[in-house]
């Protein structure tokens, strides 16, 4: 078995060596053309060669990123449309969605997941890890729920991008990730670009904003980071099935979501505020709205008033589409963390901010929440793409360095074996 695994490792390393050797040759060609005073056209052709080589070698992750981005954009748009229709019943929609997720994941897992079970997964209970992920997600939702009440839309978008440095810090501290200077530079470019754009937009709006609630919203990113790291540890160490993890996490979230109920009674929640004596009535009205299409809140409601107006007609269709895209979002997120890493998911997910902003330009996607195009959204998108390219360059350098270290270790091991044979 050791011989077979060693043979596979050598095969994989030789394949990677070939990739990086080609990359080195392209880089050296570029250096030669610069030293020889090559034409501008030749330099551009060389850059396009490097880009084509990178895309060809990592085509799967790029296709997966595009699929994830599409699903994520649709998830956020239908979440917004669901909120506009039945925003008075957040607890009902949350619990119903968790129940649907649990049923769907368990059905699919029972049909397809059991065949993939391994010995580590079969002989160990992961209930503690599942519960920990659910609790971390619940803590994140509660903090975000409070923080969003006094955080403007532009600041919300900026806070989302802060997940990059927060994840980098905790992954370095706990998972022992190591970064190149270009990783830090790329992350800074993404965060600073979006910070400048969103700060400018925040000055143009007159919405209520509070630094304390902004900090509460930022703190919501920490449990999300630990939740994703727990997923990565479970995936990488125990090779647990993605469907099983999502099914069990959804099961525990049915109970951990109940922790949010007392939060609704906080008086500063404005339209989401719900007194204790109205909780049960709100739940009954929520189910009537979602499944029967019956409006309850129709008077003294609307923008800037104590309550949102119900728009329950066809709400179940919008909610069903939201649930579908959210389930797909969860599956792809887990897959990216499983096959790649928490940081890969973080970098990929941060493009959703500018992408969602642009998606709201199209009425067939956004529906009633459509808005006019803004130049600053495209500036944000460009900043993200440029920062991501720089970040990826740092990863390539680290991968090449890792391959060289493995080569040196293999060659040292072979020399040791030869020496031992000679001495015998």
Swiss-Prot record:
- Gene name linked to the record: CRT
Cite a single GO MF annotation. Answer: xenobiotic transmembrane transporter activity
The record places the site described as pH sensor, predicted to act as a hydrogen acceptor for interactions that may accelerate progression through the transport cycle. Not involved in the proton transfer pathway at 207
* Native source species: Plasmodium falciparum
Q: Tell me the subunit arrangement.
A: Monomer.
The task this protein performs is described as: Nutrient transporter. Substrate transport is pH-dependent. Can transport arginine, lysine, histidine, peptides, histamine and spermidine. May modulate activity of endogenous transporters. Involved in maintaining the osmotic homeostasis of the digestive vacuole. Required for the asexual intraerythrocytic proliferation of parasites. Can transport Fe(2+) and Fe(3+).
Question: Outcome of mutating residue 137 to N, per the record?
Answer: Decreases transport activity for chloroquine at pH 6.0
Question: What's an example Gene Ontology biological process for this entry?
Answer: amino acid transport
Q: Where in the cell is it found?
A: Vacuole membrane
**Activity modulation:** Transporter activity is trans-stimulated by host-derived peptides containing 4-11 amino acids. Trans-stimulation by hemoglobin-derived peptide VDPVNF is pH-dependent and sodium-independent. Saquinavir trans-stimulates transport of hemoglobin-derived peptide VDPVNF. Protons are non-competitive inhibitors of chloroquine transport.
Q: Which residues lie on this side of the membrane: Vacuolar?
A: 80-90, 149-154, 200-209, 270-317, 368-377
**What positions belong to coiled-coil segments?**
none
InterPro entries, per database record: CRT-like, Transprt_Chloroquine
Transmembrane segments in this chain: where? 59-79, 91-111, 128-148, 155-175, 179-199, 210-230, 249-269, 318-338, 347-367, 378-398
Effect caused by changing residue 208 to A:
No significant effects on pH sensitivity of chloroquine transport
State what protein this is by name.
Answer: Chloroquine resistance transporter
Outcome when changing residue 326 to D: In chloroquine resistance type 2
Substituting residue 80 to A results in: Decreases pH sensitivity of chloroquine transport
Q: What is its main location?
A: membrane
The chain's Cytoplasmic topological domains, given as residue ranges, are 1-58, 112-127, 176-178, 231-248, 339-346, 399-424
What intrachain disulfides are recorded? Answer: 289-312, 301-309
């Amino acid at each position: 078995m050791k011989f077979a695994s060693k043979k596979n490792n050598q095969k994989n390393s030789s394949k990677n060596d070939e990739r990086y050797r080609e990359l080195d040759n392209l880089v050296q060609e570029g250096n030669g053309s610069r030293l020889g005073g090559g034409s501008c056209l030749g330099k551009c052709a060389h850059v396009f060669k490097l880009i084509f080589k990178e895309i060809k070698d990592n085509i799967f992750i790029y296709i997966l990123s595009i699929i994830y981005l599409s699903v994520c954009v649709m998830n956020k748009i239908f979440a917004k449309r669901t909120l506009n229709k039945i925003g008075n019943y957040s607890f009902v929609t949350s619990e119903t969605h968790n129940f649907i997720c649990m049923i769907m994941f368990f059905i699919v897992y029972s049909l397809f997941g059991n065949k993939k079970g391994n010995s580590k997964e079969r002989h160990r209970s992961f209930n503690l890890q599942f519960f920990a992920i659910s609790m971390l997600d619940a803590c994140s939702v509660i903090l975000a729920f409070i923080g969003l009440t006094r955080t403007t839309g532009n600041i919300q978008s900026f806070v989302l991008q802060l997940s990059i440095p927060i994840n980098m810090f905790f992954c370095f501290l706990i998972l022992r990730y190591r970064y190149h200077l270009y990783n830090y530079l790329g992350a800074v470019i993404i965060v600073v670009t979006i910070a400048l754009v969103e700060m400018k937009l925040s000055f143009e709006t007159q919405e209520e904003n509070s630094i304390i609630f902004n900090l509460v919203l930022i703190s919501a990113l920490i449990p999300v980071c630990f939740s994703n790291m727990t997923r990565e540890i479970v995936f990488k160490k125990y090779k647990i099935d993605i469907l099983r993890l999502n099914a069990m996490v959804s099961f525990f979230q049915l109970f951990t979501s109940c922790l949010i109920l007392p939060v609704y009674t906080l008086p500063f929640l404005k339209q989401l505020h719900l007194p204790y004596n109205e909780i049960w009535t709100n739940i009954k009205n929520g189910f009537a709205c979602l499944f029967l299409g019956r409006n309850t809140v129709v008077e003294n409601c609307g923008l800037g008033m104590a309550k949102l107006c119900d728009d329950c007609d066809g709400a179940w269709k919008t909610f069903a589409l939201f649930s579908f895209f959210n389930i797909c979002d969860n599956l792809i997120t887990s897959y990216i963390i499983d096959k790649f890493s928490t940081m890969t998911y973080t970098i990929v997910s941060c493009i959703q901010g500018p992408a969602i902003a642009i998606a709201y330009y199209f009425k067939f996607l956004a529906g009633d929440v459509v808005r006019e195009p803004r130049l600053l959204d495209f500036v944000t998108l460009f900043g993200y793409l440029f920062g991501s390219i720089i970040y990826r360059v740092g990863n390539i350098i680290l991968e090449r360095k890792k391959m060289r270290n493995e080569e040196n270790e293999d060659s040292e091991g072979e020399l040791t074996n030869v020496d031992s044979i000679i001495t015998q």
